[in-house]
Design a protein with these regions (language model features):
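Structured beta-strand/loop patches that form or line metal/cofactor-binding pockets in enzymes
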Residues: 43-86
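A short glycine/serine-rich beta->alpha loop
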Residues: 61-62, 85-93, 126-136
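Short, thiol/selenol-centered motifs that function as redox-active sites or metal-ligating centers
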Residues: 68, 91-99
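Alpha-helical support elements that line or immediately flank enzyme active sites
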Residues: 100-111
Length: 164
């Protein structure tokens, strides 16, 4: 899939892309949009843009989902004004967890640590653009859990961090 062409087609007058969930609700009310987002998830799983590690890094944190074995590590480089300048993830897991990590990191470039701390479950779901059951929801939220634990400088991540 040619992401640049897709982005040009979907961008608004301010050259900003709509969140997938808003686009799905406003433009399409059928299976085509779900199919598009499923394709995006598979593509970002197979060819992630932010897979790798950063050395040196300013923040790193990792965690796993013991139920399914997904494992995510996130590295961030932070500017002097506390904004993310680079981000990378590594690990293994299902297509949902890996694509969620890739899409999440794309959304945090340029954000401050305070903005990251304010991110919610809904931000992740908006990035993915599809509805998920409870088991897949844990897979999708693992990258956010890891990211927020790193932003808060915690020693370990708990599910409570997703409620903050």
């Amino acid at each position: 899939m040619d992401w640049k062409k897709l982005n040009v087609c979907l961008a608004d007058a301010n050259n900003e892309l709509p969140k997938p969930s808003m686009l799905r609700k406003s433009l399409f009310k059928d299976q085509r949009m779900d199919d598009l987002y499923r394709e995006i998830i598979v593509e970002r799983y197979k060819e992630p843009l932010y897979r790798g590690t950063l050395d040196p890094h300013d923040i790193t944190f990792e965690d796993e989902n013991p139920l399914c074995g997904d494992h995510i590590r996130i590295d961030l480089r932070i500017s002097d004004d506390n904004k993310v300048t680079e981000a990378a993830f590594s690990g293994h897991g299902c297509a949902i967890s890996q694509a969620s990590a890739d899409l999440l990191l794309e959304s945090v470039i340029g954000k401050s640590l305070d903005e990251i701390r304010q991110m919610t479950k809904q931000d992740v779901l908006d990035n993915l653009g599809i509805d998920l059951g409870p088991v897949r929801l844990k897979c999708a939220l693992l990258p956010l859990k890891v990211l927020k634990a790193g932003a808060y400088g915690l020693g370990e991540a708990t599910d409570d961090i997703l409620e903050e």
